[in-house]
Curated annotation (Swiss-Prot):
The gene is nuoN. Its EC number is 7.1.1.-. The chain crosses the membrane at residues 26-46, 57-77, 96-116, 148-168, 171-191, 206-226, 253-273, 297-317, 321-341, 347-367, 375-395, 421-441, 466-486, 496-516. InterPro entries: NADH-Q_OxRdtase_suN/2 (IPR010096), ND/Mrp_TM (IPR001750). This is NADH-quinone oxidoreductase subunit N. GO terms for molecular function: NADH dehydrogenase (ubiquinone) activity; NADH:ubiquinone reductase (non-electrogenic) activity; quinone binding. One of its GO terms (biological process) is ATP synthesis coupled electron transport. It is a multi-pass membrane protein. It is found in: Cell membrane.
Length: 549
């Protein structure tokens, strides 16, 4: 019988549930996002002569507030809680994510100090990005003293992507965070005030190779989804234990792990996915290079640790051999090539590649010590790197005012600018892993975790690579303090308040983390809870014991 009216029809009851958006827990991300949006509005409606001061204050206040909110959330997170999931379990708030966000925000604030520095009325960025290098339009903008203040909202969106990248709880959210982080950086790399063609070439290379790696990452997600039927990390982990949706589907998982690994290893900059780093680091504005070499590396490794320790935590035997090979190639190849470099920014780029290999030894360990060791290493390396690039911005060619990249021009710097030379020497010693610096504690932590996991051959390669890298670090120190100043000696600028603060922050962090690492390792970096039960204690030594799922 066909019902004659709606009253005779029984409709199903539909229950809808609003998403669990805890704005307080998401506040560090929301503050940075709001600053980026407001910055765009400022560019649209505020007169050009007032934008610099407004954008600088807005960006620094937003990052500072987000950092304080992150610290408050660390203290408010219950001691017996692994963490919380928000927004349909797409975002996670746990101790590792809060730690990585705090480090990223601190490094972003230090980089913003370099970005905001102006010398003789000029910043490190071109006056008009759309101008063709060498054109009349560009010269007009240079003569007018134009400031490209759009860099501030772009930096805010990049920092937002870095934060979300480390807090994503599924692959789709992580991919979105990857693009939010990467797209602004592609633009920022092409905005250098000097050597415009070189800067735009670096941006183009970074964009093309970045798009290539993103495609690998996305195809890997598709493969994992075909195997697990889900993109949530917890569901992928469960599928790895149970065998997936279909019999014989393990090749899908292995291909997915490999392709996702390629996408993430590109962002980290390991061999053989490192070729973009030297060109981009050299061509990009140095303040942006500082942000990429520190914040982006922290974000990429933070995301990698979550993916391999949580989503692929039950398939360690499948992905560990791949990372073994990549780590060895990265440490050996990058260390050898770095010895031949004659440009300071390219040398620091290859140094970054080598350090990525060192951190990979902690990832390979796949235990809680590896996680905490990698976290300490990333924090220590980040502050040292920002300080080193801050000094690079101060050493200029006497003829055109561009940065003095050739290492021969740094000869005798210890005589003309002893404070800057001593600061850079300290940073180089930290990169080399000399005792009483943060680099020594970081290397000791990651190598100790690798030895405990049975990766002693990997540690041997790491120690030998450290010896090779120490050669070119010490070579620069000898050049600065014991060589005669070059005929084309550079003009060393007096550090402004902003740049001086960045250098001082780097020096303080390098010494404090090297001399007093205990407070950071015990109170800042999360540790597995102490348990009396042997079974529970064994569980807490697992690589994923500190992550929320």
């Amino acid at each position: 019988m066909i019902p004659l009216s709606l009253s005779e029809t029984t409709l199903p009851t539909v229950t809808t549930q609003a998403p669990d958006l805890d704005y307080w827990l998401l506040s560090p991300l929301l503050v940075v996002f709001a600053a980026g949006v407001i910055g765009v509005i400022v560019e649209a409606f505020v007169p050009a002569q007032r934008r610099y001061s407004i954008q600088t204050a807005l960006a620094m206040v937003a990052v500072g507030v987000a950092f304080v909110l992150t610290l408050v959330q660390v203290g408010a997170l219950p001691a017996d809680s692994a963490g919380l999931t928000l927004a349909f379990a797409t975002v996670v708030v746990d101790r590792p994510s809060l730690f990585f966000q705090g480090v990223i925000l601190a490094l972003a604030l230090a980089s913003l100090l370099l970005i905001a520095e102006r010398r003789d009325g000029e910043s490190a960025f071109t006056g008009q990005a759309a101008a063709v290098p060498g054109s009349e339009e560009e010269r007009a903008h240079v003569l007018a003293g134009s400031q490209h203040t759009e860099v501030y909202p772009l930096v805010m969106f990049a920092v937002l992507g870095m934060q979300l990248f480390t807090a994503a709880n599924d692959f789709l959210t992580m991919f979105i965070a990857l693009e939010v982080m990467s797209l602004p950086l592609y633009l920022l790399c092409g905005l250098a005030r000097r050597r415009r063609l070189f800067s735009q070439e670096a941006a183009l290379k970074y964009f093309l190779l970045g798009a290539f790696s993103s495609a690998f990452f996305l195809f890997g997600i598709a493969m994992v989804y075909g195997y697990a039927g889900a993109v949530e990390f917890a569901a992928v982990r469960a599928a790895g234990s149970s065998g997936g949706l279909i019999d014989g589907g393990e090749p899908l998982l292995l291909i997915g792990i490999a392709m996702i690994g390629v996408g993430m290893l590109f962002k980290v900059g390991t061999v053989p996915f490192h070729n973009w780093k030297p060109d981009v680091y050299q061509g990009a504005p140095t303040p942006i290079t500082a942000l990429m070499a520190s914040g982006t590396l922290v974000a990429a490794f933070g995301a990698m640790l979550r993916v391999f320790y949580v989503a692929f935590g039950t398939t360690v035997a499948q992905w560990r051999p791949m990372l073994w090979v990549v780590a060895i190639l990265t440490m050996v190849v990058a260390a050898v090539i770095a010895v031949t470099q004659r440009d300071i920014k390219r040398l620091l780029a290859y140094s970054s590649v080598v350090h990525a290999g060192f951190i990979l030894t902690a990832v390979v360990a796949a235990n809680a010590d590896g996680l905490t060791g990698a976290m300490f290493y990333l924090a220590a390396y980040g502050f040292t790197t920002v300080g080193a690039f801050a000094i690079v911005t101060l050493v200029r060619n006497p003829d055109n005012g561009a940065e003095a990249g050739d290492l021969t021009q740094w000869a005798g710097l210890g005589r003309t600018s002893p404070f800057l030379a001593a600061s850079l020497g300290l940073f180089l010693l930290a990169f080399a892993g000399i005792p009483l610096t943060s680099g020594f504690i970081g290397k000791f932590a990651v190598f100790e975790a690798a030895v405990a996991a049975g990766a002693t051959p990997l540690v041997v390669v790491g120690v030998l690579s450290s010896a090779v890298t120490a050669f070119f670090y010490v070579r620069i120190i000898v050049l600065m303090f014991f060589a005669e100043p070059a005929e084309n000696a550079p003009r060393v600028l007096k550090p402004g308040i902003l740049t001086g603060t960045t250098v001082g922050l780097g020096v303080a962090a390098t010494l404090l983390l090297g001399i007093l690492p205990g407070p950071v390792l015990e109170h800042v970096i999360p540790q597995p809870a102490a348990e009396t039960s042997e079974a529970v204690a064994a569980e807490h030594t697992a690589a994923d014991s500190l992550f929320a799922r």
